[in-house]
Amino acid sequence: MKTNICKFVIMAAVACLGFTACTGDLDVTPIDPNMTTEVTPSGLFNKCYANLAMAGNGQGDDPCDIDGLDGGTSGFIRQYWNSNELTTDEALCHWSDDGIQQFCYNTYDSNHPMLNGYYSRLTTGISYCNQYINTFADHDATMTAEIRLVRALEYYMLMDAFGNIPFSTTLANPTRMTRKEAYDWIEKELLDLEPNLSDAKPKTDADLNNYCRLDKAACWMLLSRLYLNAEVYTGTPQWAKAAEYAKKVMDSSYKLNTTGSGKWSAYQMLFMGDNGSTSAAQEGVWRIYQDGKTTTSWAGSLFLMASTFDGNMHADCSGTYPTATNGTGQTWGG
């Protein structure tokens, strides 16, 4: 949405307050008094992560946690991409969904449904994280640091897109925070939580208990990105700090995937459904988990792949140019 902000790293290797959850601020009191609901540390921990991957508690296009958009449209990656790419000359989409053409021609305003959905996705995720931190902060220091990192990312995305933002670290009503104040808080929060994160180490889907969990490299990556655009956010450049934290990631055990497999290049392997079990896994610093079975979305990497292909393109590629296929049977043709 802003052409004067540098793009540094993709937050997923495929490659997140006016609380707006559908039933309020994550009320733990059941709507039906005949039902009881138990909020557990592991359940809420997973929900905080899942806000970046799924629309709600269902799959694909099922009902979502925010109002105004269907499940397939409301996901984090889809609206992050739409708002940052369709508003530039890097991408164009001919779909008639309300909001797409306004993005493409930069005619959006405060009533734009997808911008409102993106805003709500971030603030809803922040409310989940606030509840975890305020309820279960003493349960496990590493888990709490991870959720603080997820919340910091969502505040970063909010600040990056909207400038001045609503801010709260509890479930109380938010106060207004300027972009400079948000920058300062995010920086301090990241530096404070980093020591409690696990050491930087690539993970594969053979270890599902730790796969896609954030570690110190993810924190360094977000710090580097924050510092990279510091001049835009605060008026003061921080190039040396941006380089310092980028180098921490580069010097860690995470590495670029340089080895292809069969007819697929090393780069193509990053976007495949098995990228957690091949050499592509070593590149995934901040993964957003989707297994295509129990954790699915029409707004994640499937959107990035399927929206760029139509049926004719897929048919042509499968014969003459097999390495150009999009790796999925979905062809949405945007």
Model-derived features: positions:
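Conserved, well-structured interaction surfaces
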Residues: 42, 46-50, 55-56, 90-162, ...
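Elongated scaffold/linker segments in the mid-to-C-terminal portions of large proteins
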Residues: 45, 49-59, 63, 73, ...
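Bacterial N-terminal signal peptides that target proteins for export
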Residues: 2-9
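Membrane-proximal, proline-rich intrinsically disordered regions
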Residues: 22-76
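Short coil/turn linking the two alpha-helices of tandem helical-hairpin repeats
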Residues: 159-166, 229-235
